[in-house]
Regions:
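Anionic, Ser/Thr-rich low-complexity intrinsically disordered regions
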Residues: 1-93
Length: 93
């Protein structure tokens, strides 16, 4: 369990980083598009790139959600192990 948990936690750290970086890239591209518009330049390619960045960000967010669910499921499975009932002592009613 510890190995699987550690693996999921490591993957979650990477997924969090991807979401953070993806958000920064989307914000930066929006700023770039605004600058192009302000300068009366074409935004066609920049807008296409923005759509790709947004799609990539969404995939990273979905991956992070999947990892969080898997980690929660693993934690729940081992948090409260089901105990077997104790056998009655000999001679007890």
């Amino acid at each position: 369990m510890d190995g699987e948990r550690r693996r999921l936690e490591d993957l979650l750290v990477v997924a969090d980083r991807h979401v953070k970086v993806g958000g920064v890239l989307v914000d930066r591209q929006c700023t770039n598009i605004a600058a192009l518009r302000r300068d009366a330049q074409s935004t066609e390619l920049a807008t296409k790139l923005l759509a790709e960045l947004e799609q990539s960000l969404q995939l990273h967010i979905e991956d992070r959600k999947r990892l969080r669910r898997a980690l929660a499921k693993l934690s729940a499975r081992y948090a409260s192990p089901k105990r077997k009932p104790r056998p009655k002592a000999l001679g007890a009613n």
